[in-house]
């Protein structure tokens, strides 16, 4: 995502300069940077963000063309240089595509996200105006299943929605003139707000090419577009409001945002954090509304320091790599692997997260996150491809060790998660030698196999070796 945002805004700045400059050498440099950004954006290969941010990119390109319309001059030399750069770009991008073609094909032909048919809907409307509360995530653990499952998915750009839209409309009415950029940004915000919160018919989603975009991924384009329209509106209404009017609007808006954050994160944001939300929203709003001496010399520095502290407090900046590399359980598994190399399986419904931690520490693990599906491995248990729809996807994989072969070896837990139910015999077929499990596997009965405990129980999980009986 950061690379995509960098690519969008660097390319937009260069495109604006390209149209405004007449020096061929400068234009060649701008075009080269634009094409580099285009390659960066294209090779991200994440349609949910590419398509939604593509709408924003198209709006920005359109507005820049409108801004320079009537003054755009492209010489024959400029055209030849641009064609040459395009040709070189196609060669480089083509080589990358050819090299990665297998991976690209695997991703495009998955049941998820390749065959996803999203119609949007399901995003709580309150989440659109509760971005301020996410600033507390680095300082206070967040896990509220009724809203979302983790801090990453719940995080938002602090965009002060809908202040930017309100100010933009106010400014256009005051000036009796439509601001093209603001109008198009508001259109994008409206489109994705409706798509994310309400949804739309599948046929319309297909027409608008949104079937690969989930509601949760819309928050990125909404945040960026809201910030853009907020900055634009602040420039338009500069000096239109007195400090008293700004203070009144700030108080009302900050109160609404504080309430919205409390309502959205009911068990997370208590009374104290509501007050803090009010203060943060108030400072940010006042800085936008009143571009005076107080805003520049007092409010802006306070806000800047606050955002800096919040940003620096995000993992892993705050804690370093110790939470990943110094876990006693993982250190024990590393030691066991060095003594007896072999593949591990992490048993348990939450084993997929622990499996990723194991992989991050160099442990050969069966059920880590599969960005592209490992069809060859899973077809060892499913030669007739009965469950291919389940495991042919981007997914977090959980393992459940059972005593008898399950009627359903694979079960779908979520669009990006499935569980494989296996006996030790099936694990051996997959190449697994060791299992880390919360179950007492050495007390369970298996046909022709058993488990031998090979380490200490740490955090409720014990390492075992699979033993085959003659």
What positions do the PLM features span?
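Hydrophobic alpha-helical membrane-interfacial segments at the cytosolic entry of transmembrane helices
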Residues: 74-97, 183-191
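Short hydrophobic alpha-helices at membrane interfaces in multi-pass membrane enzymes
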Residues: 19-40, 76, 80, 241-252, ...
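Internal/C-terminal transmembrane anchor helices
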Residues: 82-94, 290-317
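Membrane-helix boundary/interfacial segments in multi-pass membrane proteins
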Residues: 1-3, 190-244, 255-278
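Soluble catalytic regions of membrane-associated enzymes that act on cell-envelope
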Residues: 310-470
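Transmembrane alpha-helical segments
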Residues: 7-19, 58-63, 67, 165-169, ...
């Amino acid at each position: 995502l950061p690379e995509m945002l960098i690519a969008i805004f660097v390319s937009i700045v260069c495109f604006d300069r390209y149209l405004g400059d007449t020096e061929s050498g400068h234009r060649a440099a701008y075009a080269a940077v634009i094409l580099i950004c285009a390659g960066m954006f294209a090779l991200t290969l994440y349609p949910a963000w590419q398509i939604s941010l593509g709408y924003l990119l198209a709006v920005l390109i359109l507005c820049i063309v409108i801004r320079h319309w009537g003054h755009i001059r492209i010489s024959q030399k400029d055209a030849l240089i641009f064609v040459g750069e395009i040709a070189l770009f196609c060669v480089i991008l083509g080589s990358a595509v050819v090299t990665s073609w297998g991976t690209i094909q695997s991703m495009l032909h998955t049941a998820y996200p390749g065959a996803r048919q999203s119609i949007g809907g399901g995003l709580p409307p309150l989440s659109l105006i509760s971005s301020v509360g996410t600033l507390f995530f680095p300082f206070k653990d967040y896990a509220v299943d009724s809203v979302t499952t983790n801090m990453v998915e719940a995080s938002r750009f602090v965009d002060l929605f809908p202040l930017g839209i309100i100010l933009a409309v106010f400014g256009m009415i005051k000036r009796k003139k439509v601001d093209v950029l603001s109008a198009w940004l508001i259109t994008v915000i409206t489109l994705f707000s409706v798509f994310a919160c309400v949804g739309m018919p599948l046929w319309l989603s297909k027409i608008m090419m949104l079937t690969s975009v989930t509601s949760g991924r819309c928050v990125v384009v909404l945040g960026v577009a809201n910030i853009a329209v907020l900055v634009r509106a602040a420039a338009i209404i500069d000096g239109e409001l007195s400090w008293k009017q700004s203070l009144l609007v700030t108080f009302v808006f900050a109160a609404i945002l504080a309430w919205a954050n409390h309502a959205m994160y009911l068990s997370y944001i208590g009374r104290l954090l509501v007050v803090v939300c009010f203060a943060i929203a108030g400072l940010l709003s006042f800085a936008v509304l009143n571009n005076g001496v107080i805003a520049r010399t007092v409010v802006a520095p306070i806000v800047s320091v606050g955002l800096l502290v919040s940003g620096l407090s995000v993992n892993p900046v705050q804690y370093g790599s110790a939470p990943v590399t110094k876990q006693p359980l993982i250190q024990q598994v590393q030691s066991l692997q060095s003594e007896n190399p072999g593949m591990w399986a992490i048993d348990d419904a939450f084993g997929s997260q622990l499996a990723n931690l194991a992989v991050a520490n160099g442990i050969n693990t069966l059920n880590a996150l599969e960005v592209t599906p490992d069809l060859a491995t899973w077809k060892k248990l499913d030669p007739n491809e009965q469950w291919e729809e389940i495991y042919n996807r981007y997914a977090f994989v959980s393992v459940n060790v059972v005593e008898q072969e399950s009627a359903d070896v694979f079960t779908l837990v979520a669009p990006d998660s499935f569980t494989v139910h296996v006996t030790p015999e099936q694990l051996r077929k997959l190449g697994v030698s060791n299992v880390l499990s919360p179950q007492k596997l050495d007390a369970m009965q298996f046909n022709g196999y058993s488990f031998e405990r090979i380490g200490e129980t740490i955090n409720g999980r014990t390492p075992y070796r699979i033993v085959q009986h003659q």
